Amino acid sequence: MSNLFSYENPIMQLLMKIGDLMILNVIYLGCCLPIFTIGAAQAGLYTAMKVMQDPEDDTSLVAAFFRGFKAGFGQVTLAWGITTLITLLVLAAGYLGHFGYGLPAWICILPVVISCWYTAQIPAFHSRFGCTAWQLVRNVWFLIIAHPLRTFGTMVLTWLPFGLLIYGLYTGDIFEFMAMAPIWITLYFGTAWYFCYAFLKKPFNVLIEHFNQTQNATAESSAEALPEAEEAPVE
């Protein structure tokens, strides 16, 4: 019976992990209340997930979240805010084009999907590679092109609640969305970001390895270019 409550028990570890995800979920929603901080809050979740999935890192998950939130508050908020604004403008233009000018629905929806796809990767990229807003805007495209399936999966998990809300408003029935409110509030976002980080872990490790190899090659080239020191003559 004592083994049931042991930290080594797989069931106990699972319950503890679920509890951690619920805590992070509530903190994330609280940090999203000023809407412009959503991107930074997502960066905080990715930082916390990195700690959670690293058995050698014993950093507090809450501390890791706020560290990522603080680090991404400037650059991620700027890049995420700009791309989100563009997404909303594209969504409005698509709505007008479809209902006002009779354009096919897929022509209106495709730019929105691409924009959402792109925006979802910004906090993830910054959480692993601290960089400027311009570097985020540029490098996220390369990540999407190199790993379309993994980044598409993160896009679906990131925007699923918002998509269901839009669909409910469009059909005039948001009962199903509201019925899932306990899941959104307690568990969804923490769990979704857990899988998002798992999706992107391998691509990020490849990028880190490539970067380290490039740095080592550059250092070796610089060392070879240095002239050999001549021995001083002995008097």
PLM segments and residue spans:
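Helix-coil boundary and N-terminal low-complexity module in membrane systems
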Residues: 1-108, 115-235
